[in-house]
């Protein structure tokens, strides 16, 4: 009897050891084994560290143009992105953009379509629309131009026919309509960019108004693939994001510049969100290189490189680990717990969903 107890106990220990090893394998994975696409980047200029850093993280990137207004500066930024793409076509994907300041022109839509056709001929696979729709640009009557304005509809019809997806940064985090709150993840941005702090400009439409216009636009274009950038400007509450994903099957989201909002929420809630919508969420950072190389600022450049590397690592630890985590993003710091997503979900989030959007497959 005593011998049987010893044998039985040994079996239990062996099973426990096996389970522990399995759990370890699931939570100590190597990021190099996971292909990645940063679905939201602005590398307008090259650096000697850029490709080695992306190699380290097994990463490609979508280079996104941002049309704020019809200016020579905006056009030069697009030329810079095209040059980057031409230099590294196996590393980068290209995303064009347009804005609507000339919406009163009767041939507005035709001119935008002609521009986009030229952009596609130069390699663009997507189109970006920015928060100037709803918050900045007005028509001749002084009315803010919302993204669901009927005068833009011919452009959406054209993109639907061409099967070209759109990435839309519409609106801002809710914080933009509130007084600056120290400790809020967005306080630094609105301190540095007061022109987008809607709280100071009561004439800017309410957050709810802009979100309603965005939702109406998505509903009116059910056959157009729409990626709502920055978690759809609803990153403070994943329940709001989930509500839209349930309602609009043509909508996806990406995480660029909204990681602090995400990690502030309950880790179990976040994990369940990523599991439920594993086919609809993509990785994004909003990292940029906005100026040509200046040898006198090489130290600043290397600081940027180290910051990018650190944040890539933080994102990976949060998603793949299974332990408490100090999420330190410089001006924003918090304690949380990583969410230990399965390999299959990580592969979709980091790569497969993005490739599906970019290739239409």
Task: List where the protein language model places each region.
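Alpha-helical scaffolding within the catalytic cores
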Residues: 45-50, 73-84, 111-115, 210-215, ...
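Acidic-and-aromatic substrate-binding clefts and catalytic sites of carbohydrate-active enzymes
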Residues: 40-48, 67-77, 101-110, 137, ...
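An N-terminally biased module of ancient metal coordination in phosphate/nucleic-acid-related enzymes
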Residues: 22-90, 353
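Sec-dependent N-terminal signal peptides
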Residues: 5-14
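Hydrophobic faces of well-ordered beta-strands that scaffold small-molecule active sites
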Residues: 37-41, 61-64, 93-97, 127-129, ...
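Active-site gating/metal-coordination segments in enzymes
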Residues: 27-29, 77-198, 202, 249-252, ...
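H/E-rich (His + Asp/Glu) clusters that bind or coordinate divalent metals
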Residues: 202, 208-216, 221-361
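C-terminal motif of bacterial Sec signal peptides marking the signal peptidase cleavage site
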Residues: 16-18
């Amino acid at each position: 009897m005593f011998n049987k107890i010893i044998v039985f106990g040994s079996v239990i220990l062996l099973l426990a050891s096996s389970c522990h090893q399995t759990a370890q394998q699931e939570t100590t994975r190597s990021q190099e084994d996971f292909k990645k696409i940063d679905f939201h980047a602005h590398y307008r200029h090259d650096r000697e560290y850029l490709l080695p850093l992306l190699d380290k993280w097994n990463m490609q990137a979508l280079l996104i143009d941002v049309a704020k207004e019809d200016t020579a500066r905006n056009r030069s930024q697009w030329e810079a992105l095209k040059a980057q793409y031409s230099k590294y076509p196996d590393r980068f994907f290209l995303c064009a953009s347009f804005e609507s300041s000339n919406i009163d022109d009767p041939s507005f839509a035709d001119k935008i379509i002609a521009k986009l056709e030229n952009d596609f001929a130069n390699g663009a696979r997507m189109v970006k629309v920015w928060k100037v729709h709803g918050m900045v640009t007005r028509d001749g009557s002084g009315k803010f131009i919302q993204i669901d304005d009927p005068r833009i509809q011919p452009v959406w019809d054209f993109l639907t026919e061409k099967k070209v997806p759109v990435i839309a940064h519409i609106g801002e985090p809710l914080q933009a309509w509130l007084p600056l709150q120290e400790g809020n993840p967005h306080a630094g941005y609105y301190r540095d960019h007061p022109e987008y702090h809607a709280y100071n400009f009561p004439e800017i439409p309410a957050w709810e108004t802009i979100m309603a216009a965005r939702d109406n636009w998505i509903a009116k274009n059910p056959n157009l693939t729409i990626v709502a950038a920055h978690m759809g400007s609803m990153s403070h509450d994943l329940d709001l994001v989930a509500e839209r994903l349930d309602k609009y099957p043509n909508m996806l989201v990406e995480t660029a510049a909204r990681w602090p909002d995400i990690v502030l929420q309950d880790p179990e809630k976040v994990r369940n969100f990523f599991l439920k919508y594993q086919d609809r969420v993509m990785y994004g950072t909003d990292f940029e290189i906005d100026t040509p190389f200046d040898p006198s600022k090489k130290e600043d450049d290397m600081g940027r490189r180290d910051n990018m590397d650190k944040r890539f690592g933080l994102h990976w630890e949060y998603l793949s680990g299974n332990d408490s985590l100090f999420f330190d993003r410089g001006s924003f710091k918090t304690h949380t717990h990583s969410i230990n997503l399965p390999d299959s979900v990580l592969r979709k989030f980091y790569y497969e969903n993005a490739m599906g959007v970019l290739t239409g497959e």
